[in-house]
Design a protein with these regions (language model features):
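Small-residue-rich hydrophobic transmembrane alpha-helices
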Residues: 61-121, 158-177, 273, 286-350, ...
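Membrane-water interface regions at transmembrane-helix termini and the short interhelical loops
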Residues: 164-172, 192-204
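Short runs within selected transmembrane alpha-helices of multi-pass transporters and secretion channels
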Residues: 82, 86, 150-169, 177-188, ...
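Transmembrane alpha-helix boundary and packing residues in multipass membrane permease domains
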Residues: 35, 39, 50-51, 68, ...
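N-terminal transmembrane alpha-helices
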Residues: 23-51, 55-56, 72-84, 88, ...
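Short alpha-helical transmembrane segments in multi-pass integral membrane proteins
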Residues: 1-35, 89-154, 198-256, 312-377, ...
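Transmembrane helical elements of multi-pass membrane transporters/channels
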Residues: 30-49, 150, 161, 184, ...
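Helix-terminus/linker motif at the lipid-water interface of multi-pass membrane proteins
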Residues: 44-62, 131-138, 194-201, 259, ...
């Protein structure tokens, strides 16, 4: 009856069966591991992708780098829009109301495609001006413009990829999105090789490679979620489509705080770069490489966070508040334990991690120091990552977004600016570690107070 033990345990949530601590941990691990592997493979493929583009030369790399933060921001807005609906789907699935879960999915497709088409029109309209607004010169702006135009045209497929992935995760299927995440990365590398090296299309080829990867993977992903999944299969419903305004209103309540957070956090990253820039080229390179190396260490946190969102969403929808709290505490505890271990690994092997990225001794020494400072904050970084995912699963996004923004702008950037004057890049990373520790503590306070449970109710839809 069940494909695997994870399916049986997910069914236990909806059927009201009691679950032992061992079963809960097995379920968390079963949902987390595929997502962790997908996160890590995505980072690795990103490195390979960046290396391929880097071989085009400095101008090509700069032209893509110029608008890279903008493309990430747009992608995060589409992801936030998808989350507003996927949280509701998880709640309805937990409540065993599969019909309404599919209704929400239909609304998500309509609203999300409309939103992505609007962003496409905006992107097409500004693609010629954006590189100059970002400070690009005449030598790279034309290439940046073409790259951004091609990316803008594929935004509906970017949304379809995100919404399909999130809907499957909401239904408890972590394996398919994880496989698709690996496939889209591999496709990106293959198409980039084809367009960049075989067809000699340069920067335009890099954009076409990304576009083709999204096109080729988003459609199968959509078919699996909307036509093949036993819970979400939209062909099961025979009644005509009916517009339900409350689904959209609740999606906005969840998505808008996340979107605002993404915009302001992107701005904070830009300010952080501006603080590091005057410290010199060695500091800039060490900062960049340390961030890259650290990203491999916190991927497990995001994988466990994906599991937390699904489990909290379904148990919250099922009205099993005690089980909801139990999963929240267990996922946060597991995340902190795993990332504490990763922190130890990062502290011990920091020289080797930076050495892989740069052979320059001065960069290696400074980057190693940065990683060792950050290692002490990893458990609290995990607390913030997983607790935020818990809150999102419960539909609680306003106050968590305020915590993220408040600590970033009021603590990290303020401290980084002050400490950089006396301690250089070391001061910037001390500020980062201090802020992550404080952020983690604030999220833990919110977790144990339980106010995240009161923010959203399925029966209010």
């Amino acid at each position: 009856l069940f494909k695997n033990k994870t399916d049986y345990l997910m069914e236990s949530i909806r059927k009201g069966r009691a679950m032992t601590r061992r079963e809960k941990l097995n379920l968390i691990v079963g949902l987390s591991v595929p997502s962790m592997l997908a996160q890590i493979s995505t980072v690795m493929m990103f490195f390979i992708d960046a290396s391929m583009v880097g071989h085009l030369g400095a101008e090509a790399s700069a032209s893509i780098g110029l608008i890279e933060s903008t493309t990430w921001l747009i992608g995060s807005l589409l992801s936030a829009a998808a989350t507003g609906f996927s949280v509701q789907v998880a709640h309805f699935i937990g409540a065993n109301d599969f019909r309404r879960a599919r209704q929400v999915y239909r609304h998500a497709l309509i609203c999300g495609l409309a939103f992505s088409l609007m962003l496409t029109l905006v992107g097409v309209g500004i693609h010629g001006y954006l590189p100059y607004w970002l400070g690009g010169g005449d030598d790279i702006a034309p290439y940046s413009s073409k790259y951004f135009l091609i990316y803008s045209l594929v935004l509906p497929f970017v949304f379809l990829y995100h919404i399909s992935e999130m809907m499957l995760k909401s239904a408890g299927n972590m394996h398919t999105p994880s496989v698709m995440a690996v496939l889209i990365c591999i496709s990106d590398v293959v198409f980039n090789y084809l367009f960049i090296y075989i067809l000699k299309m340069g920067v335009v080829g890099a954009a076409c490679g990304t576009a083709m990867a999204y096109f080729c993977i988003s459609l199968p992903n959509l078919w699996i979620s909307a036509c093949s999944n036993k819970i979400l299969n939209l062909r099961q419903d025979k009644e005509p489509f009916r517009w339900v305004k409350s689904y959209v209103n609740h999606a906005c309540q969840i998505s808008i705080p996340m979107a605002i957070q993404n915009i302001l956090m992107s701005g904070a990253q830009i300010v952080s770069t501006m603080i590091v820039a005057p410290l010199g080229n060695i500091a800039i390179a060490a900062h960049s490489f340390a961030i890259t190396a650290e990203s491999l260490c916190y991927m497990p946190g995001y994988g466990i966070g994906d599991a937390a969102s699904t489990l909290v969403g379904q148990t919250h929808g099922a009205g099993r508040i005690d089980l909801c709290k139990s999963f929240a505490y267990l996922t946060v505890g597991l995340g902190m334990s795993v990332m504490a271990l990763m922190g130890v690994v990062m502290f011990v092997f920091a020289p080797e991690m930076i050495g892989v990225l740069s052979p320059v001794e001065s960069i290696r020494e400074l980057g190693t120091l940065c990683l060792r400072i950050e290692a002490f904050a990893e458990p609290f970084f995990a607390a913030s990552i997983v607790t935020y995912s818990v809150c999102v699963g419960a539909g609680d996004t306003k106050k968590p977004a305020a915590i993220n923004l408040g600590t970033m702008w009021l603590v990290r950037l303020t401290l980084a600016y002050g400490l950089s004057k006396s301690y250089g890049l070391e001061g910037v990373w001390i500020a980062m570690a201090t802020e992550l520790t404080l952020r983690g503590c604030l999220f833990l306070v919110r977790l144990f107070r339980g106010s995240w449970l009161k923010s959203f109710r399925v029966d209010s839809l």
